[in-house]
Amino acid sequence: GIGFDVAAFLVAAPSDGQPRALGEWLAEWGVDLDNSQPGGLREPAPTRPARQVWLLQRKPGAPGAQLGKTSGWVHRAHLRHNAVRMLGGVEYLKIDERGLLIRVDGEERWLEVDNVVICAGQEPLRELQISQAAESLRFHLIGGARVAGELDAKRAIREG
């Protein structure tokens, strides 16, 4: 979901717009192209994330459990690899100069954070659809724009 995308952006090192060197990526993930190690894998050499990130969700359960069947594991692995701390079943209580006060499993706890990014819900906004229909323009309304909620890429592809 959007929280995973934002967390991945936040842990990324600043970029000059150039693709990352292949050797760096291979070392980070422990890929041995020389096949000098069994299975072509060596000990990963993770890079240091640009910042410490918490990924919190109100829904009970592990964050990312509802990510896509074919690629969700990659997103979860990437955030774990970058030491993103993930909690589900979180109740948000307060944001102030001390950070973010949350409650998890009945226990309150302060997270010392400098910034809070809220990635919460969406509501369909169909005013443009109505005006385009009035002008007899052809359009397609698919995915999260058609039905707000959990994004389902397969559904969006089928729809348009």
Per-region residue spans from a language model:
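A conserved FAD-binding loop/helix module that cradles the flavin
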Residues: 2-8, 46, 64-72, 139-160
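A Rossmann-like FAD-binding core segment of flavoenzymes
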Residues: 6-127
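A short, gly/pro- and small-residue-rich
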Residues: 9, 13-17, 130-143
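A residue-level detector for conformationally permissive "hinge/kink" positions
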Residues: 98, 113, 135-136, 152
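Ferredoxin-type iron-sulfur electron-transfer modules and their immediate structural context
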Residues: 122, 130-131, 154
